[in-house]
Amino acid sequence: MDSESVHEAEIPQRRLRVGVLGFVVLGVLAIASVLMVLFAVPMNTRYWGIFENFLDLDVYRHGGSVVVQGLPLYDGPVLKGMMFTYTPFAALLFTVWAVLSFKQAIVVWTGLNIAALFAVIVLCWKFLGYRLDAKTYAVSALATTIFLFMEPIRTTLWLGQINIFLLLLIVWDLGRDETSRLRGIGAGIAAGVKLTPAFFWAYLFITRQWRALVTAVVTFAATVAIGFVVIYNDAYKYWTGTLVDSERVGPTDAPSNQSVSGLIAQLTHTPTPSRILVLVFSALAACLGLGAAWVAHRHGQKLLGLTMTGLTATTVSPFSWGHHWVWFVPLVVLAAHYAMVSQKRWAWVAPFVFLLPVLNWSHTWWDPSVIPGTDRFVGMGLFMFVPPEYLRIPTVGVYLWIFTLAAVSTLVLFGWKKWKIPASDAPAPVTTAA
């Protein structure tokens, strides 16, 4: 560990430096966010309105119902042609939702998602050394409202997805002090529900967090074992075949597949991109992202290390739909934190650089045949825009470019410039080492 580094856990408790003007700005942005969520795509628009979908939540419910009824889980669609793509352990968890009506599930699930988003933001401030006082909670509530218009968050709520819960589980678990005996159990459970979080094992390995790594792997193995014990046939089918069936997920060249494979498929205009290209660029992205995570961890920036790992996992995953990128939430919080401690006004550009491109910008394709009952198809997120050919590279892979910017910024600030975060709220300027 660099002797000049300041660990987040070692920073005396700070106070959020948000005055009247700051609250006014946050309040205006929060109101604008709510209006955009409700009316940019009119909330009563069939299928596309914020309260008119929840397809994935219904799939979760029906997957749980299939388990309760003792029927095969992976032999065919569980709802409207939709396959159940999660683990047997996840299906067991979803049995709880099978007892609720669809409308009841929507209300409870949405409320819990918003509460989980608020909890993630509060935990970010906590792990960055801020006091959890009334001001921190107020700022977190306003930030939660602003982030509702972030595309990964809006789409997660719109579909009834599980991403925010997994984000909360990992941030709470791996953001804790490394001396915590059960640290790693949350990451193991998250991987047991959805395999992508297993990527955090690589982060624990390169940062030599052996106890957390072992705990995560053992916990994951326990979730697999539970699946075999309770629904053996489904577990056997999943782990011996269904797991690698990419056709159950979706087309690789879908615009909303914001991963390396999706970007290559889009740029080469093919649903089956070259495996060699995908492997090479995925490996490069993994090295870049994990390298940034390692540098952040080495310089005591644990939350930044976790965030870079989460962004890297979504980048290199074969399928990373827009709603998987919920790690933009801690990224923007981190950018705001670094702007506050840098004491330079221009640093406040950073949170907006990371936030604006990932908002739920939408456009309309006038084609009545696309969605029965409506006269338009509403694409959400910059990646759904149909740009001229010369603008395809910056738009179709916009989330990957945000990841790249975050990784390079981390390497430059903490790897090259050796940025030293002030250890208190003292007005001393932030310095860098040559």
Regions found by a protein language model. Give the residues of each.
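Primarily membrane-embedded glycan-assembly and transfer machineries that use lipid-linked glycans
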Residues: 2-183, 207-322, 378-395, 414-434
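Aromatic-enriched
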Residues: 40, 336-434
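Juxtamembrane/interfacial segments around transmembrane helices
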Residues: 73-83, 167, 191-199, 244-248, ...
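Transmembrane alpha-helices and membrane-interface helical segments
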Residues: 119-123, 168-176, 204, 330-344, ...
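Hydrophobic core segments of transmembrane alpha-helices in multi-pass, intramembrane catalytic enzymes
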Residues: 162-171, 195-198, 215, 325-333, ...
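A cytosolic-side transmembrane-helix exit/cap motif
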Residues: 184-187, 234-241, 326-330, 345-352, ...
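Transmembrane helices and adjacent periplasmic/lumenal helix-loop junctions
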Residues: 187-204, 316-327
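Short amphipathic alpha-helix initiation/capping segments at coil-to-helix junctions
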Residues: 301, 305, 320-328, 338, ...
